[in-house]
Amino acid sequence: MKIVSDAKHTGRTRCTIHCQNCSISQLCLPFTLSEHELTQLDNIIERKKPVQKSQIIFQSGDELRSIYAIRSGTIKSYTISESGEEQITAFHLPGDLVGFDAIMNMKHVGFAQALETSMICEIPFDILDDLAGKMPKIRHQIMRLMSNEIKSDQEMILLLSKMSAEEKLAAFLHNLSQRYAAPGFSAREFRLTMTRGDIGNYLGLTIETISRLLGRFQKSGMITVQGKYITINRMDELTV
C-alpha cells in the first residue's frame, strides 16, 4: 500500500511505498493483480498517518467511507451492549482489512481501535467499489477477504460454544501463531499486543482464568511466558 512522506512540512524528498513493494501485498487486496491493476489500486489509496495506541479508527453509526488495510500493528473490533459493556469481536493483524461490517447498511455497526501504534492504508470505499465493478480480480479478492472474515466468525462461534476454557486459550494462541506466520513473522515467538483482559473478553473468560491457564501452559513446558512475549515450545499441543 502507499505511504507518502510530507515533503511540504519535512523538506525531504517525497518517498512512496507502493502496493508492489509492500511486504503484506499477498495477504491484502493487491494479491493476484496485474501491474496495471496494481497501479490503478495504488492511485486510490490515501496516505494515513500512524494510528496511535487507543485511537478510534471508526465507531458505531459512522458512515462507511473507507476500508482500512493494516500494514503494521494490531486493531481490535468491538461492540457496546445496551448496558454499556464492551464485547470484543476480532483482533486484526498485518494484512487484515477492517471495515467490511458497514457494507450492508453503509454504516459501521461496531468500533475499531488501535491496541498499539499501527500503520494503516485508507482505501476510499466508493472508488474501490467502482474499481471492483471494472476489474474482476479486485472484486474476487474483496469477496475472498470477506469470505475469510465470515469463516473466522464461524470459528469464533465454535470456539465459544464447544470448547473448555483451556481449549479456547490453546486455540487462540495457535490461531495467533498461524496469523503471525502468514506475513513472515515467527510462528513460535510473538508479542501479545492485547491485554489479558482483552483476551478474556474475546474468549468469554475472566482475567484470572487467562492468567492461571498461561501459568499452567508454562509449567507444563508447552509455552514460555515473559511479560507480553510468548514462545511456543510444543506447537502440536496447542491444536485441539
Swiss-Prot record:
HTH crp-type domain location is 163-236
Instruction: Quote the Pfam families the UniProt record gives.
Output: cNMP_binding, Crp
GO function term, MF aspect, one: DNA binding
A GO cellular component annotated for this chain's UniProt record is:
cytosol
Q: Which Gene3D superfamilies match?
A: Jelly Rolls (2.60.120.10), Winged helix-like DNA-binding domain superfamily/Winged helix DNA-binding domain (1.10.10.10)
Taxonomic lineage from the root: Bacteria, Pseudomonadati, Pseudomonadota, Gammaproteobacteria, Pasteurellales
Q: Where is this region: Essential for the oxygen-regulated activity?
A: 15-28
Q: Its biological function? A: Confers a hemolytic phenotype on E.coli. May regulate, rather than mediate, hemolytic activity.
The record's subcellular locations are:
Cytoplasm
A GO BP entry is: killing of cells of another organism
What is the official name of this protein in its record?
A: Regulatory protein HlyX
Check the record and name the CDD domains matching this protein. Answer: CAP_ED (cd00038), HTH_CRP (cd00092)
**Keyword set, alphabetical order:** Activator, Cytolysis, Cytoplasm, DNA-binding, Hemolysis, Transcription, Transcription regulation
